[in-house]
């Protein structure tokens, strides 16, 4: 992606950022990086990272459009009361990262098939093959 941080006014609808983030979801689906559920990408749109765009709940990566992305304020305690509230795990993970790491402009969280299997094993170490 070619986005560069830009400070915008609150009345800006972040069109370019929405387009580029939506494209990243579709590319993830196209390259099979969309397995399982509870996968989320978010993009900070203000300087301190507290306002960010995130994918809506229960929409497949291949179907996400720029207009589907939800604008969230990481400092708003009423986020989960909204009718378009994000998945609670997305809110907890991405909200925390954007609040505490403003330099993390884009956060991508997925559960690739083999990584999920490996993480589910009693002994998830993967020793080198000689």
Task: Spell out what each predicted region is.
Residues 1-130:
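Glycine-rich flexible loops
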């Amino acid at each position: 992606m070619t986005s560069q941080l830009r400070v915008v006014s609150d009345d800006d609808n972040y069109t370019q950022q929405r387009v580029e983030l939506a494209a990243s979801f579709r590319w993830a689906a196209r390259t099979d990086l969309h397995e399982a559920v509870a996968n989320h990408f978010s993009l900070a749109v203000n300087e301190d990272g507290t306002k960010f765009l995130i994918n809506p709940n229960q929409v497949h990566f291949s179907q996400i459009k720029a207009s589907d992305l939800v604008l969230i304020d990481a400092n708003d305690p009423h986020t989960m009361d909204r009718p378009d509230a994000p998945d609670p795990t997305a809110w907890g993970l991405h909200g925390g990262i954007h609040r505490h790491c403003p330099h993390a402009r884009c956060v991508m969280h997925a559960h690739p098939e083999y990584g999920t299997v490996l993480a589910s094993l009693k002994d998830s170490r993967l020793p080198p093959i000689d």
